[in-house]
Structure formats: C-alpha cells, structure tokens
C-alpha cells in the first residue's frame, strides 16, 4: 500500500518559493488502478516524481507497505518494487527490445513471454523483438516498449507518467485495459 501524508513540494523562483503541490494526502491500496487527472502544469508529473524519489517533498511523508520511504533514493525504491515510466522514454543504441525486456525482468525471458508483453501494449512482436531501442523508433513506439518493460518487471507499484503521450486514442484505450489487467488479481498497483 502507498500512502502519502500531507505532501507538499515547493521550488525556489526568483528568491521566493513557488508551491507546486500543497498538502496532498492519499492512499493507494495493493492491486488498485489509480488515475490522477488535472490540468497541464497541475503537478501530476511532480507527484509521480515525488513517489518515485526523483524529487523529495518539502513537507510530509511517503509510506510504502508501512515503511517510511520519504528519504530513500530512486534506486532504493526500485529495489522495493516501485517502477516509473517517463514522459519521454530513454533510448538505448545497441540494445534490442528483447534484451531490454529481459533486463527489466532480471533474467533472460523466453521469446513467447517477450511477445506477450509487446502484444499487451499493442505492438506486433515480430516487428519489434530484434529492433534496437534507438532513435529509429517513434515516440509512441518507445513509450509502449517502456510500458512493456514495467510489466515485465512485475512491480509492486508501477507509475506511468503521461502514458498517452505519442499514442493514439484507440491504442491508449487498449493500454488502459492492459493496466487494469496488470492489477487484477495481484498485489501490483498502477498509477497513471
């Protein structure tokens, strides 16, 4: 379970503090699918970065499975089973999609399992398994592959920051169903 207690986040701008997030509390149960909505610049991505540990709150606590993780690093949170998909996925020249999925899973994945992850995000696995994760991929393709890597990790908490970026509406509807299936009947939670 993820619990945010009175989380605030401020940044210094021209000698004064700009409040990005003000006193947010929320609880996300194991196995839940949670969507956070709001206007552009409303703090959604900042909240995701706070949960992942990329940013630290100026006030409040973040608890994960009863443990205070507020001061833990990104790496320490990842070891606890928290994963994050960026708005702009990274590219890895020389690394194939299949190898990336295996790295995410922590061991060499059989081809059929890799294909299953790619299919669940709307990609034809035969077209992508041996492709490199480089700039030849469109933004939407890279985003889907990054989502598939989080699915392969079998996380306790997966955070998807603007997963719709670069993805058409029909495909995103299918991704939402994949997110729900990921959480259904498991302890894995997803925040979109």
Task: Map each language-model feature to its residues.
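The feature captures the beta-strand-to-loop junction immediately N-terminal to the Walker
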Residues: 37-39
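Q-loop/switch helix immediately C-terminal to the Walker
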Residues: 88, 94-113
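Walker B catalytic motif
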Residues: 162-163, 170
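Conserved ABC transporter NBD signature motif
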Residues: 60-67, 80, 113
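Helix-to-loop junction immediately C-terminal to a conserved catalytic motif
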Residues: 52
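ABC ATPase NBD coupling module
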Residues: 68-83
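ABC ATPase C-loop
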Residues: 150-151
């Amino acid at each position: 379970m993820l619990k945010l207690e009175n989380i605030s986040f401020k940044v210094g701008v021209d000698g004064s503090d700009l409040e990005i997030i003000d006193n947010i509390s929320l609880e996300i149960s194991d196995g839940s699918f949670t969507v956070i909505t709001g206007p552009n610049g409303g703090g959604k991505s900042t909240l995701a970065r706070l949960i992942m540990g990329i940013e630290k709150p100026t006030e409040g606590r973040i608890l994960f499975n009863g443990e205070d993780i507020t001061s833990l690093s990104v790496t320490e949170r990842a070891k606890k089973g928290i994963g994050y998909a960026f708005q702009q996925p990274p590219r890895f020249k020389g690394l194939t999609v299949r190898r990336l999925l295996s790295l995410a899973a922590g061991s060499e994945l059989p081809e059929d399992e890799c294909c299953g992850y790619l299919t669940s995000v709307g990609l034809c696995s035969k077209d992508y398994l041996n492709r490199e994760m480089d700039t030849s991929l469109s933004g939407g393709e890279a985003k889907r592959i990054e989502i598939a890597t989080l699915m392969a990790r079998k996380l306790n908490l997966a955070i998807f920051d603007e997963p719709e970026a670069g993805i058409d509406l029909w495909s995103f509807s299918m991704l939402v169903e994949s997110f729900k299936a990921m959480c259904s009947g498991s302890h894995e939670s997803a925040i979109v």
